[in-house]
């Protein structure tokens, strides 16, 4: 699946470090604290391959998980959840109509939700589903660079829609750099905010140096571990944890907090592990043990 940050020592020489006393860091710390204290429920309509890691990561981060593949379950539980997570990594024929119904229900009832457009551009059914989400867009999009670029083209956003040079769909892995997706991510986030009841939206793009934007500000987040590319579901579980944070915070803060949590935790897990198997176990332990203060003090820059 899509993956979280991969390189701990990426170049940040052209970026502006966010100061320790910047208000955004306190908002991130408070969001992390609220998750630990409130154990918010975030439901997931996610793929078969990574569902176990998604649920365990949500629990380890401090939230409560509910997983379902029945559209009626998702719509019935939506009002009781702080947020919903939809991942299109594995599809069945009936999902084409079901996911449109779910997104319309969430939109009409003002429910916050996170979209992971896994493998955007691959297959007719997935393309139709993702195009349909434009009418009832999510609160947050969490993607890799290639997925963000493809979705930007699908939704025909911005002055350069359909003209950006990129490598196109590449299955579940990114074929483009995060830097190549800055304009696409910013346009997507602005579109989400425009159609949100609270006028807030965010896009998080995972890569060598993660990117999070609300359509105005662009944050970059170095850190993490290359071992995240060696376990299945790193990016998918980040989407689920982003939904957990979205249950207690706005789109920008939730996206930043979840990505910073993953960067801190994956770095700690790499130091404590000896390979992919022990890394995944150590990663879940790190999600559980990291403090709100450690999350809020993780490397954070403004582009």
Swiss-Prot record:
It comes from the Bacteria. ATP binds at residues 142, 206. Its EC number is 2.7.1.50. Residues 1-23 are annotated as: Disordered. Coiled coil: none annotated. It catalyses: 5-(2-hydroxyethyl)-4-methylthiazole + ATP = 4-methyl-5-(2-phosphooxyethyl)-thiazole + ADP + H(+). Pfam families: HK. Disulfide bonds: none annotated. Substrate binds at residues 67, 233. The keyword Transferase applies. Keywords: ATP-binding, Kinase, Magnesium, Metal-binding, Nucleotide-binding, Thiamine biosynthesis, Transferase. GO terms for biological process: thiamine biosynthetic process; thiamine diphosphate biosynthetic process. Its cofactor is Mg(2+). The keyword Phosphoprotein does not apply. One of its GO terms (molecular function) is magnesium ion binding. Signal peptide: none annotated. Residues 1-15 have a biased composition (Polar residues). Catalyzes the phosphorylation of the hydroxyl group of 4-methyl-5-beta-hydroxyethylthiazole (THZ). Belongs to the Thz kinase family. This is Hydroxyethylthiazole kinase.
């Amino acid at each position: 699946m899509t993956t979280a940050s991969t390189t701990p020592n990426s170049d940040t020489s052209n970026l502006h470090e966010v100061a320790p006393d910047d208000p955004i860091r306190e908002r991130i710390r408070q969001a992390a604290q609220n998750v630990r204290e409130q154990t918010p429920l975030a439901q997931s309509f996610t793929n078969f391959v990574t569902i176990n890691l998604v649920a365990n990561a949500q629990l380890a981060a401090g939230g409560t998980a509910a997983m379902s593949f029945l559209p009626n379950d998702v719509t019935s539980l939506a009002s009781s959840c702080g947020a919903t997570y939809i991942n299109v990594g594995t599809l069945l024929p009936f999902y084409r109509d079901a996911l449109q119904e779910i997104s319309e229900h969430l939109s009409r009832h003002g429910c916050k939700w996170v979209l992971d457009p896994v493998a955007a551009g691959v297959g007719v059914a997935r393309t139709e589903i993702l195009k349909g989400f434009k009418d009832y867009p999510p609160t947050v999009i969490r993607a890799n660079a290639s997925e963000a670029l493809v979705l930007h083209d699908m939704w025909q956003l911005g002055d350069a829609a359909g003209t950006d040079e990129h490598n196109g769909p590449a299955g579940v892995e990114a074929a483009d750099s995060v830097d190549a997706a800055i304009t696409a991510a910013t346009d997507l986030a602005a579109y989400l905010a425009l159609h949100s009841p609270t006028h807030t939206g965010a896009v998080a793009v995972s890569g060598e140096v993660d990117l999070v934007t609300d359509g105005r500000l662009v944050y970059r987040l170095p850190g993490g571990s290359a071992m995240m590319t060696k376990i299945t579901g790193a990016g998918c579980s980040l989407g689920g944890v982003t939904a957990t944070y979205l249950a207690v915070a706005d789109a920008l803060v939730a996206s930043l907090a979840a990505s910073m949590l993953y960067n801190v935790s994956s770095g700690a897990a790499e130091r404590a592990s000896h390979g992919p198997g022990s890394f995944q176990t150590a990663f879940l332990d790190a999600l559980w043990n990291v403090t709100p203060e450690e999350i809020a003090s993780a490397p954070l820059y403004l582009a």
